Amino acid sequence: MVPTQMFLTRGVGVHKEKLASFEQALRSAGVAYCNLVTVSSIYPPNCKIVPRARGEKLLNPGEITFCVMARSETNERNRLTSASIGLAVPTDRRTYGYLSEHHAHGETDEETGEYTEDLAAQMLATTLGVEFDPNIAWKEREQVFKMAGKIVRTLNITQSAIGKPNRWTTVIALAVFIPEENIPKRRR
């Protein structure tokens, strides 16, 4: 089973109970009705990213649904928490790319998002033989990767929130793989 479609989503939940906060985040992300199974970080060859709204319509309640998930939570007042998924897509769509996940405290959306995007690009670059200096800033490395002609696109989806008093705050970011049997034949 190699997925051919996936979507990116994110959510935030706040509740006095930790588990209920996670459930609220899943609802916010639009995937609470699925049985999520987390997998490692490979973006499948020939996989297409579809809009969240389309992807949600292709999932069924109770279905086993594979995803890459980043999750962070806090019950500390005013603590910034964030979760992000980064993606690096190779120029040759017949080969695989990378998804990375990161969760943090005290990092902004931009910091967390850039970190995951950079991490996914680094993982892909090393498998493609692209040489780079890991000590230079992400924006410079991004240009090196793209100029090498082997990485066509990088992106991230990130969610952050600030902890509320006497409440759990959970943030999640996900890459959700759509089961092949759910994709109408004409859309494959």
Give, region by region, the residue ranges found by the protein language model.
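Helix-coil modules at protein/domain termini and other flexible surface or pore-lining loops
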Residues: 1-188
